[in-house]
Amino acid sequence: MTADGALEFPSLRVRVDAARAAEFARETGFDASFDGAPSCYPAVWLTTPTIHGAIARICAQADSVPVHESQHFAYEMPLRVGEDYDLSVSMRREEKPPRLVVEALLATLNGAPVGRFETLLRLVPRAALRRDAVA
């Protein structure tokens, strides 16, 4: 954890998998002729056990459910299908509004910057969900 309370992870080796990129492209509305990785493809890396597990623990500690609020992707160079990259991720909580900010930097294996990504997850208290379900 950093001085400002952010949780930082060791760099993760990730790959733009051809089959997963094609599946993700179809899931996000690209037609079958699209050949590449959608710019939002790095969202799939949030499901890695390390990142997903941390999000789940933070939500459990906050007795909250994560609701996707927004994402932002900015690139220095395009993603290449079949390439391996190093992904550095940090997370921090914000109280007003209650949310989890997930920030990531993607680099080539020789350290050249590829892109920056940010995902905002609103932390909705489970008590509010139960209250709304009863109303």
Which residues does each predicted region cover?
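Hot-dog-fold acyl-thioester-processing enzymes
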Residues: M1-S70, R131-A135
